[in-house]
């Protein structure tokens, strides 16, 4: 994931938290905010120290980034996303992480509409 596709600054995070919409399941919370003047999606990650040591937190962040790499082309691009990992996320494999995030993507309707094929 390129640096320009990441949320880094506290102000950027606060803007998404205050003005964005959230959706959650047991493992993750996703905040999303429309950014109409932006071409590509941006991703911010938050993994609390309560979840585990640095190795565990970095592993979770790598898994989330990989899911966004694989699914990113299907998501609405003109948005900022923040993913907050909850404690149960530390026990997930990559496939389970992907499934959990896909569930949230469907629930929050962030997949791009596919053009219907006409017969």
Curated annotation (Swiss-Prot):
| A GO CC annotation given for this chain | ribonuclease P complex
Give the EC number(s) under which this enzyme is classified: 3.1.26.5
User: Which InterPro entries does its entry note?
Assistant: Ribosomal_Su5_D2-typ_SF, Ribsml_uS5_D2-typ_fold_subgr, RNase_P, RNase_P_CS
Which keywords label this protein?
Endonuclease, Hydrolase, Nuclease, RNA-binding, tRNA processing
**What is the name of this protein?**
Ribonuclease P protein component
Q: Which reaction does it catalyse?
A: Endonucleolytic cleavage of RNA, removing 5'-extranucleotides from tRNA precursor
The domain of life for this entry's organism is Bacteria
Does the keyword field hold RNA-binding?
Answer: yes
Gene designation: rnpA
Family indicated by similarity:
Belongs to the RnpA family.
- What does the organism's lineage look like at the top? Bacteria, Bacillati, Bacillota, Bacilli, Bacillales
What the entry lists under PANTHER family is as follows:
RIBONUCLEASE P PROTEIN COMPONENT
Function recorded in the entry: RNaseP catalyzes the removal of the 5'-leader sequence from pre-tRNA to produce the mature 5'-terminus. It can also cleave other RNA substrates such as 4.5S RNA. The protein component plays an auxiliary but essential role in vivo by binding to the 5'-leader sequence and broadening the substrate specificity of the ribozyme.
Q: Which cysteines are joined by disulfide bonds?
A: none
User: Which NCBIfam families does UniProt cross-reference here?
Assistant: rnpA
UniProt-listed GO biological process terms: tRNA 5'-leader removal
Task: Specify whether Glycoprotein is a keyword of the entry.
Answer: no
Q: How does it assemble?
A: Consists of a catalytic RNA component (M1 or rnpB) and a protein subunit.
The molecular function terms of the Gene Ontology recorded here are: 3'-tRNA processing endoribonuclease activity; ribonuclease P activity; tRNA binding
């Amino acid at each position: 994931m390129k640096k320009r596709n990441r949320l880094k600054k506290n102000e950027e995070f606060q803007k998404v938290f205050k003005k964005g919409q959230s959706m959650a399941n047991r493992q993750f919370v996703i905040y999303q905010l429309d950014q109409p003047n932006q071409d590509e999606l941006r991703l911010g990650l938050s993994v609390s120290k309560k979840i585990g040591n640095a190795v565990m937190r970095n592993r979770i962040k790598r898994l989330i980034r990989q899911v966004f790499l694989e699914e990113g082309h299907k998501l609405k691009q003109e948005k900022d996303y923040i993913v907050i990992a909850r404690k149960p996320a530390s026990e997930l494999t990559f496939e389970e992480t992907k499934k959990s995030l896909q569930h949230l993507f469907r629930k929050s309707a962030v997949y791009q509409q596919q053009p219907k094929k006409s017969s």
